[in-house]
């Protein structure tokens, strides 16, 4: 059955889980994390469903792709190139303020982009029996977090690469091939060895920041203890059903 039929709506942010929509859950978590200004980028249907919060909320209609949405949010907030901002997906049903705080506090002031990774062991412990996909690295198995910290200047400077990565984001293999093409000038020395290590699970996450600095001029920081709540998103009806049951069994996540 299509996800929209199971969830009762075609707009993810308006999926209802245990009495609250996804957009309401995420916005409350952002406020609990101390975020004072929030740009919501999405369907106009979301505009009429925004909860009343103490935080200042701004709205922008969604663009053609996720990167366009980031640009619209940054523009709506009026952020300068040197500013860092927190990006958070809307389909995080178990999101908490503390999970976001951990990510925010882990972001070095000089980082251009902070990417969160959740250890598989922590995810499975919190969400036993949940559907998920983990990637294997030299440091172990991890899930990607659906929240990140980014500098506006990095977003502006890396638009072509970020658009290609956004288009490939649902497939680890496609992401790897996208990066391989991006490093074509260093194919023999960096691209091919990097891809080989990735596909065999031998790639060390710790090796990526120096590569990003050398090839992109970007300061990449990897946070390898991102909370499981940041890694559970909803892409399938199975994801939705599990989240609904999990929230019903954990009353402290009730808004």
Annotate the PLM regions.
Residues 1-45:
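N-terminal glycine-rich phosphate-binding loop and ensuing alpha1 helix
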Residues 36-38, 84, 112:
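Residues at the starts of beta-strands that form the adenosine-phosphate
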Residues 41-44, 89, 117:
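Short beta-strand/turn micro-motifs composed of small residues
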Residues 51-86, 94-95:
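Short phosphate-binding loop-to-helix
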Residues 96-214, 225-229:
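Conserved core of the sugar-phosphate nucleotidyltransferase
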Residues 221-224, 233:
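Conserved active-site beta-strand element of glycosyltransferases/polysaccharide synthases
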Residues 236:
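Short, conserved phosphate/pyrophosphate- and ester-handling motifs at nucleotide-, phospho-/glycolipid
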Residues 240-246:
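Short amphipathic alpha-helices within nucleic acid-binding modules
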């Amino acid at each position: 059955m299509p996800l929209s039929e199971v969830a009762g709506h075609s707009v993810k942010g308006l999926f209802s889980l245990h009495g609250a929509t996804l957009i309401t859950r995420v916005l409350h978590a952002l406020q609990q994390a101390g975020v004072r200004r929030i740009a919501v980028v999405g369907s106009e249907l979301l505009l009429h469903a925004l909860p009343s919060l103490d935080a200042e909320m701004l709205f922008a209609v969604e663009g053609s792709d996720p990167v366009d949405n980031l640009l619209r949010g940054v523009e709506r907030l009026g952020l300068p190139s040197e500013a860092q901002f927190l990006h958070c997906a809307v389909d995080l049903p178990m999101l908490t303020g503390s999970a976001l705080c951990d990510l925010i506090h882990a972001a070095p002031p000089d980082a251009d982009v902070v990417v969160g990774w959740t250890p598989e062991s922590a995810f499975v412990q919190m969400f036993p029996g949940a559907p998920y996909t983990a990637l294997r690295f030299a440091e172990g198995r991890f899930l990607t977090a659906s929240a990140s910290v980014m500098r506006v200047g990095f977003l502006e400077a890396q638009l072509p690469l970020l658009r290609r990565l956004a288009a490939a984001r649902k497939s680890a293999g496609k992401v790897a091939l996208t990066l391989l093409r991006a490093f074509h000038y260093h194919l023999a020395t960096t691209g091919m060895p990097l891809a080989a290590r990735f596909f065999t699970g031998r790639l060390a996450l710790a090796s990526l920041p120096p590569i990003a600095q050398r090839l992109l001029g970007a300061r990449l920081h990897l946070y390898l203890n991102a909370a499981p709540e940041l890694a559970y998103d909803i892409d399938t009806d199975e994801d939705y059903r599990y989240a609904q049951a999990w929230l019903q069994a954990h009353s402290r996540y009730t808004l």
